[in-house]
């Protein structure tokens, strides 16, 4: 087999597995967990963006050169706090905080993974459906990986 021959399969595998993970979150835990996941990821992305713009100096990864260490830490803190506050309405404090923290970590990993795939493919943005935001995958890349973590932890 050739390494290059597996690349076209990623077009089908990459979106299929996360959809199954999101569906599993919904089936196992209900609509609250699905919205909770999306809110944690949004808090991580937003916190990272704003803290990174305000205080970011240290580059985080060559895969995504605009990310800063300060932004990533700020995003993890924002997501953990907001996720825990929302999660305790349904789950225990410890499960809420643990799940929020790990979902946030894997949201960052998902974002970096999607950036890596785009760089390998020589693509700057993953579409123009959402102007100014780099495409649809840039909006859901973090949710894609984080969904697997939520399935495992809940």
Identify what each model region corresponds to.
Residues 1-68, 72-105:
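Membrane-embedded alpha-helical bundles of polytopic integral membrane proteins
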């Amino acid at each position: 087999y050739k390494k290059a021959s597996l690349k076209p399969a990623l077009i089908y595998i990459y979106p299929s597995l996360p959809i199954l993970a999101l569906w599993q979150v919904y089936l196992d835990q209900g609509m609250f967990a699905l919205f909770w996941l999306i809110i944690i990821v949004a808090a991580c992305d937003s916190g990272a963006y704003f803290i990174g713009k305000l205080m970011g100096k240290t580059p985080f990864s060559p895969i995504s050169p605009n990310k800063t260490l300060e932004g990533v830490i700020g995003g993890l803190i924002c997501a953990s706090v907001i996720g825990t506050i929302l999660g305790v309405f349904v789950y225990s404090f410890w499960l809420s905080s643990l799940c929020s923290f790990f979902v946030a970590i894997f949201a960052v990993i998902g974002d970096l993974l999607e950036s890596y795939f785009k760089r390998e493919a020589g693509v700057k943005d993953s579409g123009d459906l959402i102007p100014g935001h780099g495409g649809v995958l840039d909006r859901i890349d973090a949710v894609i990986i984080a969904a697997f973590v939520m399935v495992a932890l809940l």
